Amino acid sequence: MERLEEARKRLEEAKRVAVLTGAGISKPSGIPTFRDAEGLWKNFNPLDYATPEAYARDPEKVWAWYAWRIQKVREAKPNPAHYALVELERRILSRGGSFLLVTQNVDGLHARAGSQNLVELHGNLLRARCEACGKRFPLPEAFAPPPFCPACGHRARPDVVWFGELLPEGAWERAERAFAEADFALVVGTSAEVEPAASLGRIAFASGAYLVEVNPEPTPLTPLAHLSLRTGAVEGMALLLPPSPEDQAEGHLS
């Protein structure tokens, strides 16, 4: 309990907060993770669906899989952990601090919950990107895959980062800078195994940030964390960010 109280105190006093989230934060919303016992990669080989080579071989197969995932994402709703991060952002910004949320997730749930200062490191399932002109555009509620670019009419691909691809331009630089400058870093629901995102916690620690991890299982980041909460994202965020009397009176974090 002493470590938890210390973490809460540090968070209340923090001026520069950086947060990294992974698949574990969206699991309570019904979005499957990738690497646990029930994860997507247990039933689907990533080399068959999530590489440029797989798309070049069989774009229809890849799009059919993504259309299924997109439907799952549209059916999902943000959960209390997503909303807790929206509230954390509000608190930090209201006292003149800086806040950046970096997510490895492509489900768009952080944006739907209301997060403003957000970097979607691996893209967004609800967008497509033209293979010819590069235009990004939101996918309509109903579409027949593959979609076509509204600007030039060329076929579009999912606007996500596949294995072997570079991150979106500027995304990594913004994320790295936020974690290097943070005085409080929070890592929620990630195995801390996928680079380069896995290095963000280490960057923050090396720069002197107070580091908190929320994950049911230990990760490579655990030995560095000042506090590791061995629990799910919803429970962990509730422990770390209990509502203040003012928030309860105003209806925040309800």
Curated annotation (Swiss-Prot):
Single GO term (MF): protein-succinyllysine desuccinylase activity
Chloroplast listed as a keyword: no
Entry's localization field: Cytoplasm
Main location class: cytoplasm
Domain spans labelled Deacetylase sirtuin-type: 1-250
Residues that coordinate or bind NAD(+): 22-41, 104-107, 189-191, 215-217, 233
Binding site for substrate: Y66, R69
Enzyme Commission number(s) from the entry: 2.3.1.286
InterPro entries the record matches: DHS-like_NAD/FAD-binding_dom (IPR029035), NAD-dep_sirtuin_deacylases (IPR050134), Sirtuin (IPR003000), Sirtuin_cat_small_dom_sf (IPR026591), Sirtuin_class_III (IPR027546), Ssirtuin_cat_dom (IPR026590)
Keywords, in A-Z order: Cytoplasm, Metal-binding, NAD, Transferase, Zinc
Domain of life from the UniProt record: Bacteria
Function as written in the Swiss-Prot or TrEMBL entry: NAD-dependent lysine deacetylase and desuccinylase that specifically removes acetyl and succinyl groups on target proteins. Modulates the activities of several proteins which are inactive in their acylated form.
PANTHER family the record matches: NAD-DEPENDENT PROTEIN DEACYLASE, NAD-DEPENDENT PROTEIN DEACYLASE SIRTUIN-5, MITOCHONDRIAL-RELATED
Name of this chain's protein: NAD-dependent protein deacylase
Organism encoding this protein: Thermus thermophilus (strain ATCC BAA-163 / DSM 7039 / HB27)
Gene: cobB
